Swiss-Prot record:
Membrane association type: Multi-pass membrane protein
Natural source organism: Oryza sativa subsp. indica (Rice)
Record-given protein name: CASP-like protein 1B1
Quaternary structure (record): Homodimer and heterodimers.
InterPro entries, per database record: CASP/CASPL (IPR006459), CASP_dom (IPR006702), CASPL (IPR044173)
Length: 195
C-alpha cells in the first residue's frame, strides 16, 4: 500500500520518529518556560528589594561623634534599574505565554512566540550584562578613575546583588535553551533529524 503511494516504509518510520521528537520538544517547552519565569522573577524581586544602610563616624566634635549614614539602593544605579525592568518584563512575558499557551498552539502564533522569545532573550542578556558590569565595578572599583570599591562597606547589598545576577544568568541560559527548543520544534522536518 505504501509503495503504491510512492512512500517507502523507512520514510514513514522516519516521519513518525520526527513527530515524536517534535512532540517531546513541545511538551518540554512549558517546563523550561516555567523555570525561566521563576529565575527572572526571583532576580527582579531580589534586586528590587536590595537596600543597605551603613553608618560611620565622620568627625568628632568635642567628645561627641558626628555620624553619617550612607545608603546603597538599586535605584541609585541605572544599570540595576534596567536589570530589574528587564527581568520583570521577561518574567511577565513568560507567565503570559504559560497562561495563554493553549491559544498559541497554531504554527503562526508559535512562530510569533519564537520571535518574541528572541527579543526577550536579548533584553534579558543585556540587562544581566550591564548589571554584572556595575557589580564588578562595585566589588573591585576602578583605581584609574579613583572609584573605590563599596562591597567592603555594603556586603549584604553586594551579596544580594550577586544572587540576583546568578538567578538572572540562569534565566538567560534557560531562555536560550527555550529558543533552541522552539526553533527545533518549528523547524521543517528535514532539519530536526539532521538529514
Amino acid at each position: 500500500m505504501d509503495l503504491e503511494k510512492g512512500k517507502k516504509p523507512s520514510e514513514q518510520a522516519a516521519a513518525c520518529r520526527i513527530m515524536q521528537v517534535k512532540d517531546k520538544l513541545i511538551t518540554l517547552q512549558p517546563v523550561v518556560r516555567a523555570c525561566v519565569f521563576l529565575a527572572t522573577a526571583v532576580a527582579a524581586v531580589i534586586m528590587g528589594l536590595n537596600k543597605q544602610s551603613y553608618t560611620t563616624v565622620v568627625a568628632i566634635v568635642g567628645t561627641r561623634p558626628v555620624t553619617q549614614t550612607f545608603t546603597a539602593k538599586f535605584k541609585d544605579t541605572p544599570a540595576f534599574v534596567f536589570f530589574v525592568i528587564a527581568n520583570a518584563i521577561a518574567s511577565g512575558y513568560n507567565l503570559m505565554v504559560l497562561v495563554t499557551r493553549r491559544i498559541l498552539q497554531r504554527r503562526a502564533q508559535s512562530l510569533s512566540v519564537h520571535l518574541l522569545d528572541m527579543v526577550i532573550l536579548t533584553l534579558l542578556a543585556t540587562g544581566s550584562a550591564t548589571a554584572a558590569s556595575m557589580a564588578q565595578l562595585g566589588k573591585n572599583g576602578n583605581l584609574h578613575a579613583r572609584w573605590n570599591p563599596i562591597c567592603d562597606k555594603f556586603g549584604s547589598f553586594c551579596n544580594h546583588g550577586g544572587i540576583a545576577l546568578m538567578s538572572s544568568f540562569i534565566g538567560v541560559a534557560l531562555m536560550l535553551a527555550l529558543n533552541l527548543l522552539s526553533a527545533a520544534a518549528n523547524s521543517p522536518r528535514s532539519n530536526v533529524t539532521g538529514q
